[in-house]
Regions:
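Charged, amphipathic alpha-helical coiled-coil/dimerization segments
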Residues: 71-129
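N-terminal leader segment of winged-helix/HTH proteins
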Residues: 1-32
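C-terminal regulatory/oligomerization modules of transcriptional regulators
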Residues: 1-2, 126-134
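A cross-family signal for key residues in well-ordered alpha-helices
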Residues: 42, 104, 133
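Alpha-solenoid HEAT/Armadillo repeat architecture
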Residues: 1, 45, 60, 122-125
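N-terminal helix-turn-helix DNA-binding core of bacterial DNA-binding proteins
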Residues: 21-64
Length: 134
């Protein structure tokens, strides 16, 4: 196995272990919500004027899939749609009180997981992060 394959395999292993560690707590705290709904809520909660196109590009889904997902979420009252006065064509989304609740739970879980994993990342120096990112 060459170095590139070793690095990719290492990343995959870390990703899979984190997913496994996070899964039980995430499923318990967000029971009743589909993973796609939670990711959509996360995107809407973190971005200004999110629309179908922005969400599709970020979530690597088709616009059709996002449209279907947002319609379902509108019906469940996790999100609301709105339009700007200067652009009646484009539809944007914002979180309802229920959506904000899910967003906050999800963010808190990520902070807990980050704290849990802190010991793994402490020995890594900035130069090493830079090497991975460049």
């Amino acid at each position: 196995m060459n170095k590139k394959e070793e690095v990719l395999e290492g990343f995959a292993e870390v990703f899979n272990k984190r997913a496994w560690l996070d899964k039980v707590k995430m499923e318990k705290a967000l029971a009743g919500y589909a993973a796609s709904e939670v990711h959509c809520i996360e995107f809407i909660g973190k971005h200004k004027d999110p629309n179908v196109t922005k969400m599709a590009e970020s979530m690597y889904m088709t616009r059709g899939a996002i449209s279907k997902l947002t319609k379902k979420m509108l019906k469940k009252q996790y999100i609301e749609s709105y339009q700007k006065a200067d652009n009646k064509k484009e539809i944007y989304f914002k979180l309802t009180a229920e959506g904000k609740k899910v967003f906050e739970i999800h963010e808190q879980l990520h902070k807990e997981f980050e704290n849990r994993d802190q010991a793994v990342f402490e020995p890594i120096k900035d130069e090493q992060y830079d090497a991975f990112l460049n």
